[in-house]
C-alpha cells in the first residue's frame, strides 16, 4: 500500500515521503496513530496544502524535545530494591520503575521512551540507560540501584 508520511517514522521515512508498506502495517498502525494517510490523489493535494503547517509543527516539536533532552541529560535516577548479599536483586528494575521516578523528578517520560539495551536491571550499581524523547533526540541517563537487605 502506498502511504504519505505525516511524521518522521524510524526506519521508514520522513515527513511528506510517499512510501510503500505492507497493508496491515498501514491499516493497523500507521493510519490509526495519525502518522500516515493513504496516497490517493485527493490526500496528496490536501497534504501539499498543509505541508508548511505540518513542517512547522514537526520543527517545533523537535525543538521542544531537544530542550527537554538538554535538561534531562546527565540526570541520575536513584532506586532502591530488595537485594541479596551478592548484589543481585530479588526482582528487577524495569522501564516502568524508571519512568515513574523520572516523572516524580519533574521529567514526564513514557515507559515506551526508555531504552534498556540489556533488558531489566537485575544487579545493584550504576547502569546507563537511554531515553528516546523523539526519533532524533536520545539522551543517556544513569540509573543507580541501591540494595535493601531483605
Swiss-Prot record:
The keyword RNA-binding applies. InterPro entries: Ribosomal_bL9, Ribosomal_bL9/RNase_H1_N, Ribosomal_bL9_bac/chp, Ribosomal_bL9_C, Ribosomal_bL9_C_sf, Ribosomal_bL9_N, Ribosomal_bL9_N_sf. It holds the Pfam family Ribosomal_L9_N. Transmembrane segments: none annotated. GO terms for molecular function: rRNA binding; structural constituent of ribosome. Keywords: Ribonucleoprotein, Ribosomal protein, RNA-binding, rRNA-binding. It comes from the Bacteria. The keyword ATP-binding does not apply. GO terms for cellular component: ribonucleoprotein complex; ribosome. GO terms for biological process: translation. PANTHER family: 50S RIBOSOMAL PROTEIN L9 (PTHR21368). Binds to the 23S rRNA. Belongs to the bacterial ribosomal protein bL9 family. This is Large ribosomal subunit protein bL9. It comes from Polaromonas sp. (strain JS666 / ATCC BAA-500).
